[in-house]
Amino acid sequence: MQEVIKMQNADGSWTNQVLIGKFSKNKEYATELSKKVNVSVVITKLVVLWIQKRHNTKQYSLILKKAQAWLKRKIAEEAIDEEQLNKI
């Protein structure tokens, strides 16, 4: 877990593409989606979902808030369909 936390960028995003294979339930879909939309959005969404599902969200609340704020901004700026992201 700490390894993943250390990978978070100062803006709240994650960009290491290895994380797609590590956290995606549907790797093919996530890989294809990352070709259509900002790959950092896909990776960050995957990490946020993983933390929420598998770890104490209170302990990681600041990390999650920063990531979610970044996601919200990028989704709006790039007009990304959140339904597509929710399928990953």
Task: For each feature predicted by the language model, list its residue ranges.
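Preference for long, amphipathic alpha-helical scaffolds in soluble/luminal domains
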Residues: 1-88
